[in-house]
Design a protein with these regions (language model features):
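Rossmann-like dinucleotide-binding domain for NAD(H)/NADP(H)
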Residues: 212, 220-313, 357, 387
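Rossmann-like adenosine-cofactor binding region
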Residues: 39-45, 166-259, 274
Length: 387
């Protein structure tokens, strides 16, 4: 029985994909695999038998990636599974920042007892007049799964879209509208655009990237939208930019005491991926990733180990090895096999930074003694006999 612990509520449509060989109600201390959404894992003591963690979502800043890699725990995420939900959320943010719908709604609530509210509304509505987004310039920083959807949707709404992503993948480029103007210097986004939306991960290089220097380059009355990660925007600096008129509105999906209730700021309670469809998609994708890894040893959509997809094993045996990305380990792995008289039918090795992953399909079964000898090799982190 394979024990799975769910640190957060995971959609049943995903959990239903586990076969009878899985126990999806296991305690964390007994878990072979973990499903998580937002639970913070940095201070958790990870079980020795833990093989994998799947994040039902894209961001993984709540998971200790390096610690997991050191223990041979493969961490997965579900890129793109919630992309449409976040895209729609960003479009809503664009409209909320352009048309004072929230102010209008509040006026109606405050005047609900007015017998002539319809007549009064005709006089009051001029206070909530806004601007149309059609024809305006939108800068999209980050053109991954979400950013490209936002860019394409904004084109359909008649906006002039500028996209910046120095790491743009080939697949993302193919999916991007040809009408999106590719920008090679992010400063051009700051200088040219009426609206700016951010879609990058939280890295040391991106923390506080939207800062005073960026605001100083912006046009008067720029709208900034952050539905990506809370640390990307220097929020004290953006409050100053709002006071000076550089920024007309700041829409953020990350509530905190700095921005909540501030003039010119629309704070949403982290609703970007909070749709039934997104939660279902993320759960299904996360469970499939876990099963593929546990049952076949394949790594797809990992964030701390290299992707390595060898399909279903058709040989007599398959062993997988998480190891350090250092010279001579491959020769040592094959030497152990050769000394044991085990023929290697096929082998794949992939690396990512300091870590690597090897899959060996063999002509005969892998014994416990062979697995132990593989584990004893210097630099090997975890050995698992899959078949």
């Amino acid at each position: 029985m394979i024990n799975v612990n769910c640190l957060n509520n995971i959609a049943s449509v995903g959990l239903d994909l586990f076969s009878s060989d899985y126990n999806a109600n296991a305690a964390f201390e007994e878990a072979d695999a973990v499903l998580v959404r937002s639970a913070k894992m940095h201070d958790m003591e990870l079980p020795d038998n833990l093989l994998a963690i799947a994040r039902a979502g894209a961001g993984v800043n709540n998971i200790p990636l390096d610690k997991c890699a050191d223990k041979g725990i493969v961490v997965f995420n579900t890129p793109g599974a919630n992309a449409n939900a976040v895209k729609e959320h960003v479009l809503a943010a664009l409209l909320l920042a352009s048309r004072d719908l929230l102010g209008g709604i509040k006026w109606v609530e405050d005047n609900k007892d007015d017998a002539d509210i319809a007549k009064s509304a005709e006089k009051a509505k001029k206070a909530f007049a806004g601007k149309e987004i059609k024809g305006k310039k939108l800068g999209v920083i980050g053109l991954g799964a979400i950013g490209q959807l936002v860019a394409n949707a904004a084109i359909s709404l008649g906006m002039e879209v500028y996209g910046y992503d120095p790491y743009l993948s080939v697949n993302a480029a193919w999916n991007l509208s040809s009408e999106v103007k590719h920008i090679v210097n992010v400063e051009d986004i700051y200088k040219e655009c009426d609206y700016i939306t951010i879609h990058v991960p939280a890295l040391d290089s991106t923390k506080g990237m939207i800062n005073k220097a960026a605001f100083d380059m912006m046009k008067k009355g720029t709208v900034v939208i952050n539905c990506a990660r809370d640390v990307l925007v220097d929020e004290p600096a953006i409050l100053d930019a709002i006071k000076s008129g550089k920024v007309a509105k700041y829409v953020t999906d990350f509530p905190n005491t700095t921005t909540a209730g501030q003039e010119g700021v629309i704070v949403l309670p982290h609703l970007g991926a909070s749709t039934e469809e997104a939660e279902d998609n993320c759960a299904v994708m996360a469970v499939k990733e876990l099963r593929n890894y546990i049952e076949n040893g394949n790594i797809v959509n990992s964030v701390n180990y290299p992707n390595c997809d060898c399909g279903v094993c058709t040989s007599a045996g398959r062993v997988t090895v998480c190891h350090k990305n250092v010279p001579a380990i491959i020769s040592k792995l094959t030497s152990v096999m050769g000394d044991a008289g085990i023929n290697i039918d096929s082998m794949d090795n992939k690396s990512r930074g300091d870590y690597a992953y090897s899959v060996l399909d063999t002509g005969s079964a892998i014994t416990e003694d062979v697995a132990a000898k593989l584990s004893a090799i210097d630099g090997v982190i975890k050995v698992r006999v899959v078949k």
